[in-house]
Amino acid sequence: YTRRAFLNGKLGLTQAEAVMDLISADGRQGAALANAALGGALAKKINAQKAQLTALQAHLAAWVDFPEEDVPEVSQAELIATLSEQRDTLDQLIAGYGAGAVLRRGVDCVLLGRPNVGKSTLLNLLAGFDRAIVTPVAGTTRDIVEQAVQLGSVRLNLFDTAGVREVGADGDAIEAEGIRRSWKKLDEAGLILAVFDGSERPTREDLELAQRCAGRPAIALVNKEDKPTRFDAELIAPYFAMVLPVCCQEEGARKVIAAAVARLLGTSQIDPHAASLSGQRQLSAATRARDAVAGALDAAQGLGLDAVSVCVDDALDALCELTGENASEAVINEVFERFCVGK
């Protein structure tokens, strides 16, 4: 039905994609983003850009092709201002893609730390019920425990992992396999919550974990804030986006963590009712358009109006592909392959 609506001109391609996004959205914010796209928010924004670029291209073509006619001269200052505005608009759309994807589909979040630092307690706090077994015995969690939770505006697919520590050659083979899986999950995660015991001094395992988190979307949680602090957070701070003292046994920690996650992932800056890009197809087309506009801007400052015109043509082609006006049959088929029968 959605494909038929697209082929009959009732829906644009971005609106058709929004139907599937709405069906598969995780949480209210993701649904709001999809609903905005279904209402035409993205299409209207892109169409406005196309109208400005088309008007600019017509002026350029008239000036270049009919120099003997009384065509108003193309002002370099106005040209640069128009192209800069177009580039900035596309930059904003592209910059918001990652956070929008998180709101739409959620993010895989791994809980990592030494044994008995409070990872499973954290999982239970975020889940809102006793999902994992918690005991004073180190190494209680040996395999990965999964749980999806809604944390503020973000859906987290949580993975509580085995405590990471050094296991000798003659150590427990099951625990060693659990630790191997923990490190593997770190490499796959879109978000890392690294847990440290605030009542103890940092260990070699703590520092190794911190170093492995460097350059990744990671938050350090120094747990057991309710006990005297012995942990020197400055030793791990360089490796994390932020370091938070928390007590995972207190409900208030959930709000603190939710705010930090939203800040790190950029979801707190997203207006769910505004235009946003969804999926690699849209991102790729918008990126090509942005690069073409940037090329036109460079050309306007040295190469001449012919080069500007070529780049503006490329930008218009990319924007028309984004909205579906000149999308190939293969692209259209790929979009609608995501739909199940009856949608």
Regions inferred by a protein language model and the residue ranges of each:
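Conserved active-site aspartate in kinases
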Residues: 160
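Phosphate/Mg2+-binding loops and adjacent switch elements
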Residues: 21
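C-terminal-of-GTPase-core extension/linker across diverse P-loop GTPases
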Residues: 12, 17, 28-150, 156, ...
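N-terminal accessory targeting/assembly segments
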Residues: 1-15, 26
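Inter-motif core of Ras-like GTPase G domains
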Residues: 175-199
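Terminal RNA-binding accessory module
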Residues: 123, 154-157, 183, 193-194
